[in-house]
A protein has these predicted regions:
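Nuclease-adjacent, charged terminal/linker segments that flank catalytic cores
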Residues: 1-121
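Generic preference for hydrophobic/aromatic residues in regular secondary structure cores
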Residues: 48, 68, 168, 255-257
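Short, charge-rich amphipathic segments
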Residues: 77-98, 116, 145-156, 176-185, ...
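Short charge-dense sequence patches
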Residues: 101-114, 139-140, 165-172, 197-199, ...
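Short glycine/proline-centered loop/turn elements that form peptide/ligand docking sites
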Residues: 122-130
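Acidic-basic catalytic patches of nuclease active cores, encompassing PD-(D/E)XK
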Residues: 130-177
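Catalytic core segments in nucleotide and nucleic-acid processing enzymes
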Residues: 171-295
């Protein structure tokens, strides 16, 4: 009887396109935006307000990222469950597989322990036979997690700016075209206090970019500096594996690394003048720039 069950090595093209569209639709419906989760966590946990009051910004960023990430993973679990539960309703091949498995198992004739055992067997075989769909969903989740990690970091930093009353323009706030109009590319995420300030005097504006992980991607920032002739750029990161050699190389490209206090003040890094903590960045560097514009 099993010969009647469709054998799927890869998704049929039409179903792949439909499944990809379903993933996007369900993801938008069941996974909350980073900004919504950040606001929720901050409203429910007063610890973060205390951390800001005591100027422990490294801990604030670390703990908030962890909490927001956990909320995201909870959303992802619900999203996965609902999508897989609805799979047989929405796509023909999973529907056919499940109907054959249920028919072959004669599940409607069974009761008690035999019914429970049959349900387990059907669920296991169904999961195995629709695995190409599960695999494609897993690839989508991996991609989404990468982009979500970066987006969440941005939202957290911008929320800090707002709480501290710092004016800023970001690509997500004013649009890509505004940044393009002053010659800045997509590698620049924000300007403090504003694009107008940058236009008026470049060396009295803080140009910022954010990367959760440096690896080789910081070189994209160096290329942006070279292309746009920006005097200096602040690269905010939560990457804790910053070597002295990498920091020195970035210093040669006028990149100031903004990172956790314990990283900036670690034995290998603390002598590097282009590596500063979130605390120094938020309570020294930015206020000094903003003072200039308040004259």
């Amino acid at each position: 009887m099993n010969k009647k069950i469709p054998t799927i090595i890869e998704l049929p093209k039409l179903e792949q396109e439909k499944f990809d569209a379903l993933i996007k639709k369900y993801r938008d419906k069941y996974i909350r935006p980073s900004s919504e989760i950040v606001d929720l966590v901050l409203s429910e946990d007063k610890e973060f307000l205390e951390l800001i009051k005591s100027k422990q910004m490294s801990l604030y960023i670390l703990k908030l990222r962890e909490k927001v990430w956990q909320e995201y993973l909870n959303d992802e679990i619900d999203f996965n469950a609902v999508l897989m539960k609805d799979l047989h309703k929405l796509l023909d091949t999973p529907k056919e597989i499940l109907e054959i498995l249920l028919s072959d198992s004669k599940i409607i004739d069974k009761k008690g322990e035999e019914l429970v055992s049959t349900i387990k067997e059907v669920c296991g075989e169904y999961a195995g036979r629709v695995f190409p769909y599960i695999y494609r969903l897993s690839l989508s989740n991996t991609q989404s997690r990468r982009s979500r990690a970066g987006k969440t970091f941005e939202v957290i930093i911008y929320k800090v700016y707002e709480i501290l009353g710092y004016d800023y323009d970001s690509q997500s706030k004013v649009g890509r075209k505004m940044f393009d109009s002053v010659g800045l590319g997509k590698k620049v995420d924000s300007i403090l206090p504003s694009i107008e300030a940058f236009k008026g005097r470049r060396n009295k504006a803080i140009i910022g970019t954010m990367k959760t992980s440096l690896r080789e991607r910081w070189q994209e920032v160096a290329e942006e500096i070279e292309r746009t002739k920006i005097p200096v750029i602040h690269l905010l990161t939560v990457d804790e594996s910053i070597s002295k050699s990498k920091a020195m190389e970035m210093a040669n490209h006028n990149i100031i690394i903004v990172t956790f206090d314990w990283v900036a003040n670690s034995e290998n890094i603390r002598t590097m003048k282009n590596v500063i903590s979130f605390e120094e960045y938020l309570f020294d560097e930015i206020p000094n720039i903003l003072k200039f514009w308040k004259k």
